[in-house]
């Protein structure tokens, strides 16, 4: 009887193993604080590398804080400045601040990486997008590949590498305009100065793709 019970218990454990061992979102790197994590039902604590996260976790940084997160889907993003966001399944809900997100190159059957704001949702089809939201503006910039943007007011746009969608929010009426290609000099400036691209423990997976696509070089060669 004991042998049967033990075997049954092992069977239950093996059956449950896939869900128990499922990958959790994780804090990958925290180059600078202040950076904070608030797990569901818990108090806010300082973010630390290797920390496991869960659905509905709230992440926050204050200047000069920044950190890198890897989701259970394998998508990654970096956030910084006065940023605030929530993890919701495989979607990132950005309430304010700056974020750069990417899909690892070479993945087969990869699904889009979705980042939501109160004004629009950006869906990464290619590999890398930068989003910044504050009281004055919403900026969506495709570093590499295709990014689809759907606004809450019904507009739809598709950005290609080097294109930017910029919306001024300090106007009586929010007006959306088609994305525009930024100049090479501006792309170089952003790539070399960005605190979300440079200064982390390891370079972004898509950095070489960005450099090849835009013909510019970053400083980060960690």
List each language-model region with its residue ranges:
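Internal catalytic-core helix/loop-beta-alpha segment
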Residues: 121-127, 134
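Short, small-residue-rich packing micro-motifs
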Residues: 59-122, 140-149
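Short N-terminal segments immediately surrounding and downstream of signal-peptide cleavage
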Residues: 21-40
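C-terminal interaction modules
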Residues: 1-23, 43-49, 72, 80, ...
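Flexible, membrane-facing loop/turn or short amphipathic-helix motifs
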Residues: 38-42, 106-111, 133, 151
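Generic short beta-strand segments
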Residues: 32-35, 64-67, 127-128, 147
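Short, exposed beta-strand/loop patches in secreted or surface proteins that constitute
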Residues: 28, 50-52, 85
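N-terminal post-signal-peptidase region of extra-cytosolic proteins
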Residues: 39-56, 62-65, 126
């Amino acid at each position: 009887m004991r042998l049967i019970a033990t075997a049954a218990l092992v069977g239950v454990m093996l059956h449950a193993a896939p869900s128990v061992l499922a990958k959790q979102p994780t804090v990958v790197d925290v180059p600078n604080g202040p950076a904070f994590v608030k797990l569901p039902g818990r108090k806010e604590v300082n973010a630390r590398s290797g920390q496991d996260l869960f659905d509905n976790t709230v992440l926050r940084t204050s200047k000069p804080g920044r950190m890198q997160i890897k989701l259970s889907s394998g998508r990654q993003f970096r956030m910084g400045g006065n940023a605030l966001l929530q993890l919701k399944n495989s979607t990132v809900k950005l309430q304010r601040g700056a974020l750069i997100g990417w899909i690892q190159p070479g993945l087969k059957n990869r699904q889009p990486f979705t980042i939501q704001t109160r004004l629009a949702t950006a869906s990464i089809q290619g590999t890398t997008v930068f989003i910044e939201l504050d009281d004055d503006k919403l900026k969506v910039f495709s570093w590499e590949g295709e990014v689809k943007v759907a606004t809450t007011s019904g507009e739809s746009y598709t950005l290609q590498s080097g294109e930017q969608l910029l919306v001024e929010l300090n106007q009586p009426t929010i007006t959306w305009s088609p994305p525009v290609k930024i100049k090479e000099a501006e792309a170089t400036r952003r790539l070399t100065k960005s605190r979300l691209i440079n200064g982390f423990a390891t370079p972004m997976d898509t950095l070489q793709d960005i450099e090849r696509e835009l013909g510019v070089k970053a400083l980060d060669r960690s």
